[in-house]
A protein has these predicted regions:
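Conserved, single-site charged/polar hotspot
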Residues: 2-466
């Protein structure tokens, strides 16, 4: 979306709910268990939100950190390619890794299907049973080969597997005595399967349209990185949430169709279109999260005013804070003070805070030693919604706390510690609640989604790619 994949401990969703953050490892499948194999090597923890923080709201649901802003973003070079825009002659296909499995896989077809693999090809209808014997995939007992493609035919052809219905086809790869399951689906149907899980279908069309373009762009960016791999994305907040066709609505499909083929580019290439639930008043620059710069991910004013995500307050204690540091292997003994620049009004960057005020690092000084932790580490250890926060020892702050005052010194054993924070998610790219507010106030002219995107992504172009 958006740690994600770093905090990815929160990281995708993101970009939104704030309870998932991220990074998945490959685990071997057992019996009927479906496992998402790990994303290609990543250097950040799952904050998927943190994929670690992903939460769902009732009426207006957003995945707080989707896609996770994991270190995945660090794979991008500081210099953006200036190659000319390469458009597709037709809609591209996305490969979504649904999981891995060792037991028989039941597959139901909405219509007929062609089963293809190697030199084998036959028609099938109804319910199928997919198994693996050695390095051979079998469909209804017929050997197909090391790879089988189940391709539904007819308009609206779809299949159901693993409890979900999907557009497109199913690719099954025999692997280590089990099978790897990949949904091969047109990009537009993929985006339609992402949108209702990343943004409430009841939101204004301009917000849904902006999210659709972000989801499409994010997918294309990852497809470019996945050359030579079995798949492009997973259906989790490690990337962005995708659960097939069942939750599509007229509103979400309309937003996808209205923006069909529209993609955000920088230097002629699809951008890493991260998004998150709520920027908390100001989004962050990539350089302050990853240490390298992406010119289109700059901190900007966020228009969210949503209660519960724009600002939040946690009450804890010195004892609890010491215990959490100890449990994380970061014990400093009895806390004396926290070295951290007091939270100010954005934009205002300091050595330990980004332009939005998000914590880059904080030092905990104790009786035995001192430890410096990154904002993402603290978000994970303390279970925070974002890294835009400050500590207040024995002082209960108001949401509109006057900036600049420091309350970071511990004076007694029963010190009360308040943590005032803003936003939900990694803070990079599109703020979903900010998009909602802009769409609520903007014109319903079919073009306003572009203004939303141009606000949250700096210096981009929005092009028709197919």
């Amino acid at each position: 979306m958006i740690f994600s994949k770093q905090l990815k401990a929160t990281i995708m969703a993101a970009l939104f709910t704030g309870t998932s953050l991220v990074t998945m490892g490959i685990t071997s499948a057992t019996s009927n268990t479906v496992v998402h194999s790990a994303k290609r090597v990543q250097t950040e923890h799952k904050t998927k939100p943190s994929k670690v923080i992903t939460s769902t709201k009732s009426t207006h649901k957003t995945h707080t950190n989707t896609p996770v802003a994991s270190r995945k973003g660090q794979q991008e070079s500081n210099s953006i390619s200036s190659k000319s825009v390469v458009r597709y002659s037709q809609e591209p296909t996305v490969r979504v890794l649904l999981g891995s499995r060792t037991e028989t896989l039941p597959v139901s077809l909405s219509s007929g299907a062609k089963v293809v693999g190697g030199k084998t090809s036959f028609s099938a209808t109804g319910d199928l049973k997919v198994t693996v014997s050695g390095n051979t995939v079998k469909v209804n007992g017929k050997a197909v080969g090391p790879t089988a493609h189940i391709k539904p035919i007819g308009v609206g052809g779809a299949f159901t597997a693993l409890g979900q219905s999907y557009h497109g086809g199913l690719k099954v790869i025999a692997r280590n005595g089990g099978m790897r399951l990949i949904n091969e689906v047109g990009l537009e149907d993929y985006v339609a399967g992402v949108l209702p899980y990343e943004m409430s279908p009841s939101w204004p069309q301009a917000a849904l349209q902006a999210q659709a373009v972000a989801a499409r762009t994010y997918a294309l960016n990852n497809m470019a990185k996945a050359k030579g791999q079995d798949y492009d994305v997973t259906p989790s907040t490690d990337y962005q949430v995708y659960k097939g066709k069942e939750r599509e609505t007229q509103a979400t499909r309309k937003a996808v169709q209205h923006t069909q083929g529209m993609v955000m580019t920088y230097g002629g290439q699809p951008i890493n279109a991260l998004f998150h639930s709520d920027g908390g008043g100001y989004t962050e620059s990539a350089v302050n999260v990853w240490g390298n710069d992406l010119p289109y991910l700059k901190g900007v004013k966020d228009y969210s005013t949503h209660e519960g995500t724009r600002s939040w307050l946690i009450t804890t204690s010195r004892h609890d804070l010491e215990a959490k540091l100890r449990a994380a292997g970061k014990s400093v003994g009895s806390l004396k003070k926290i070295e951290l620049t007091p939270m100010g009004r954005a934009p205002l960057e300091t050595r330990d805070r980004g332009i939005s005020g998000r914590v880059k690092q904080a030092t905990f000084v104790g009786a035995s030693k001192k430890v410096t932790l990154t904002g993402d580490q603290l978000r994970s250890i303390l279970g925070l919604k974002s890294t835009l926060f400050d500590f207040y020892v024995n002082h209960k702050p108001s949401v509109q706390e006057k900036p600049g005052r420091s309350y970071h010194t511990f004076t007694r054993k029963n010190d009360v510690v308040y943590i005032l924070g803003h936003g939900w998610g990694h803070g990079l790219g599109l703020s979903q609640w900010g998009a909602y507010e802009m769409a609520q106030k903007g014109p319903n002219n079919g073009e306003y989604y572009k203004k939303i995107l141009n606000h949250y992504y700096t210096g981009i172009q929005i092009d028709k790619w197919y």
